[in-house]
Amino acid sequence: MSPFKIFFFTTLLVAAFSVSAADFNTDVNVAWGNGRGKILNNGQLLTLSLDKSSGSGFQSKTEYLFGKIDMQIKLVPGNSAGTVTTFYLKSEGSTWDEIDFEFLGNMSGDPYTLHTNVYTQGKGDKEQQFHLWFDPTANFHTYSILWNPQRIILTVDDTPIREFKNYESLGVLFPKNKPMRMYASLWNADDWATRGGLVKTDWSKAPFMASYRNIKIDSKPNSNWYTQEMDSTSQARLKWVQKNYMIYNYCTDHRRFPQGAPKECTTSS
């Protein structure tokens, strides 16, 4: 059997569930938290809570080699300083691959920081951070990870905020060989999450709660996402977000990379 056929068969095997939507009972397990993670409304809603003793988290029952995963999330309201709410993909092992949405809480009235990163073979250091153009605690909003062999696209309410392309031809690592599981969690990170750890979690406000709904997992290789690219409209929206709401970009951190930006940052396409 040719390498391509083996690869395609593996993709089909890992993507056995194909497309699933909006049923946490079917698609995920509450992995930790001693009852702080709860599946409600016949599998249509999942809540995670955090108190001084523990946070909580859940994970998909299946691993996926490429896919498009949508999740609606309503973040912790009020004074969420010190808390981190997450939605991400991650493979197993010490040289893991990972694609991150991490929502760093803040004091009442201050915006959340959306922290994104991409790891390949255990190496990350590709952080981009954003503020959002809405209050993510007032209503549910859709956060999506599109991961295909050519690119990773992160979107918020169908607006792209980040694209990470496959530049293996330039020697840049890209996650494409290891199936990943979907994870989500709510946990305390007041040693670093808010203003570098200067603002601590106010436990008098506990328990903190984040809500998830309308999970949709499409891992079917013949779907549109498998070859999806950014059209001109999407590129314009991406530039709008990055111009107005990006607050950190590793590509422009000259102190961190005094010898020059990483290779993927210097490409024009």
Curated annotation (Swiss-Prot):
What does its PTM field state?
Contains at least one intrachain disulfide bond essential for its enzymatic activity.
UniProt tissue specificity: Highly expressed. Predominantly expressed in stems. Expressed in shoot apical meristems, also found in seedlings and meristems.
The alphabetical list of record keywords is: Apoplast, Cell wall, Cell wall biogenesis/degradation, Disulfide bond, Glycoprotein, Glycosidase, Hydrolase, Secreted, Signal, Transferase
The record places the site described as Important for catalytic activity at 100
Catalyses: breaks a beta-(1->4) bond in the backbone of a xyloglucan and transfers the xyloglucanyl segment on to O-4 of the non-reducing terminal glucose residue of an acceptor, which can be a xyloglucan or an oligosaccharide of xyloglucan
Question: Which residues constitute the signal peptide according to the record?
Answer: 1-21
Localization (cell): Secreted, Cell wall; Secreted, Extracellular space, Apoplast
Q: Which GO terms describe its cellular component?
A: apoplast; cytoplasm; Golgi apparatus; plant-type cell wall; plasma membrane; secretory vesicle
GH16 domain ranges (all copies): 22-212
* GO molecular-function term, one example from the UniProt record: hydrolase activity, hydrolyzing O-glycosyl compounds
Q: List the disulfide bonds.
A: 251-265
Which Enzyme Commission numbers does its entry carry?
2.4.1.207
Q: Its induction, per UniProt?
A: May be transcriptionally regulated by ANGUSTIFOLIA.
Catalytic residues in the record = 98 (nucleophile), 102 (proton donor)
Family that this chain belongs to: Belongs to the glycosyl hydrolase 16 family. XTH group 2 subfamily.
Function summary: Catalyzes xyloglucan endohydrolysis (XEH) and/or endotransglycosylation (XET). Cleaves and religates xyloglucan polymers, an essential constituent of the primary cell wall, and thereby participates in cell wall construction of growing tissues. May be required during development to modify the walls of cells under mechanical stress.
Kindly provide the name given to this protein in its UniProt entry. Answer: Xyloglucan endotransglucosylase/hydrolase protein 24
The organism's taxonomic lineage, starting at the top:
Eukaryota, Viridiplantae, Streptophyta, Embryophyta, Tracheophyta
**Name of the encoding gene:** XTH24
